[in-house]
């Protein structure tokens, strides 16, 4: 769920997104402390008349401002590298879905099934039912099993697109002639919305993404009904 006025991230529904939120808070605290220190020093310089115009050498100060930034960078880099390794490709996904971007819709192919593919178009505002979201509903949702590792293969048929679902921490470019990969695992069922995040033409704002994460049994029933 999104926060009013976009004041915060969407609620995390995957382990990766939870880690990204923790990393964001960790980095933001470091930035806040550094900014506070810099502002304090600037205000001190502007409000005091004490200066050291004759200082030519200060080994202690130079040592501190060399070592301290290095420590801060390490504190930022280590958790960042940990998340990057967590986001790396998986060797044995439970399901693989191929996503192709078009002007201006998405097509999906479940590669583990012989003939399970469909196009996904935005539902026009005039056709929305009560309670449905404007510019975010589609005629065919991507139904996926929850609590299982899923590999998304993402490419494009025409121009640059970007397949993004914020609550899952996913954003992968769809590039013509190139196959990019993303991994997702949902910890709870629900509907998760995203949009194309790369300007791709006049109808860029009208190619939403809707993932429906369901228990494995419901996914098997859905896939059987689609074949």
UniProtKB/Swiss-Prot annotation:
Sequence ranges on the Mitochondrial matrix membrane side: 46-59
Q: Name one GO biological process term.
A: ATP synthesis coupled electron transport
Q: Name one Pfam family in it.
A: COX2_TM
Origin: domain of life: Eukaryota
User: Can you say where in the cell this protein is located?
Assistant: Mitochondrion inner membrane
This protein's record includes keyword Lyase: no
Q: Which GO terms describe its cellular component?
A: mitochondrial inner membrane; respiratory chain complex IV
Task: Identify the keywords attached in UniProt to this record, alphabetized.
Answer: Copper, Electron transport, Magnesium, Membrane, Metal-binding, Mitochondrion, Mitochondrion inner membrane, Respiratory chain, Translocase, Transmembrane, Transmembrane helix, Transport
What's the Enzyme Commission number for this chain? 7.1.1.9
Q: Which residues lie on this side of the membrane: Mitochondrial intermembrane?
A: 1-14, 88-227
Q: Which PROSITE patterns match?
A: COX2, COX2_CUA, COX2_TM
| Keyword Transmembrane carried by entry | yes
| Annotated binding of Mg(2+), by residue | 198
The entry's Cu cation A1-binding residues are 161, 196, 200, 207
Q: How is the cofactor bound?
A: Binds a dinuclear copper A center per subunit.
Residues spanning the membrane: 15-45, 60-87
What Gene3D superfamilies does the entry give?
1.10.287.90, Cupredoxins - blue copper proteins (2.60.40.420)
Query: What does the record give as cofactor?
Result: Cu cation
Q: Which residues does Cu cation A2 bind? A: 196, 198, 200, 204
Tell me, what is one Gene Ontology molecular-function annotation carried by this entry? cytochrome-c oxidase activity
- What membrane topology does this protein have? Multi-pass membrane protein
Fetch the PANTHER family from UniProt: CYTOCHROME C OXIDASE SUBUNIT 2, CYTOCHROME C OXIDASE, SUBUNIT II
What do we know about how this protein assembles, alone or with others? Answer: Component of the cytochrome c oxidase (complex IV, CIV), a multisubunit enzyme composed of 14 subunits. The complex is composed of a catalytic core of 3 subunits MT-CO1, MT-CO2 and MT-CO3, encoded in the mitochondrial DNA, and 11 supernumerary subunits COX4I, COX5A, COX5B, COX6A, COX6B, COX6C, COX7A, COX7B, COX7C, COX8 and NDUFA4, which are encoded in the nuclear genome.
Q: Which family does it belong to?
A: Belongs to the cytochrome c oxidase subunit 2 family.
Q: What is the recorded name of this protein?
A: Cytochrome c oxidase subunit 2
Native organism = Tamias quadrimaculatus
What is this protein's gene name? MT-CO2
């Amino acid at each position: 769920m999104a926060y009013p006025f976009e004041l915060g991230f969407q609620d995390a529904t995957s382990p990766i997104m939870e880690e990204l939120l923790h990393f964001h808070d960790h980095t933001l605290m470091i930035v806040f402390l550094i900014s506070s220190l810099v502002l304090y020093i600037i205000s001190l310089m502007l409000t005091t008349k004490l200066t050291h115009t004759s200082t030519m050498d200060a080994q202690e100060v130079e040592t501190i401002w060399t070592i301290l930034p290095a420590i801060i960078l390490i504190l930022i880099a280590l958790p960042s590298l940990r998340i990057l390794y967590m986001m790396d490709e998986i060797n044995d996904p439970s399901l693989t879905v191929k996503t192709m971007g078009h002007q201006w819709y998405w097509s999906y192919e479940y590669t583990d099934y012989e003939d399970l593919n469909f196009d996904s178009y935005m539902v026009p505002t005039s056709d929305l039912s009560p309670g449905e979201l404007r510019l975010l509903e589609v005629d065919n949702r991507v139904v996926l099993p929850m609590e299982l590792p899923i590999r998304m293969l993402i490419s494009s048929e025409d121009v640059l697109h970007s397949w993004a679902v914020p609550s899952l921490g996913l954003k992968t470019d769809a590039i013509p002639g190139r196959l990019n990969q993303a991994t997702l695992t949902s910890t709870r069922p629900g509907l998760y919305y995203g949009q194309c995040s790369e300007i791709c033409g006049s109808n860029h704002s009208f190619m939403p993404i809707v993932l429906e994460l369901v228990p494995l049994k419901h996914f098997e029933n859905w896939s059987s009904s689609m074949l």
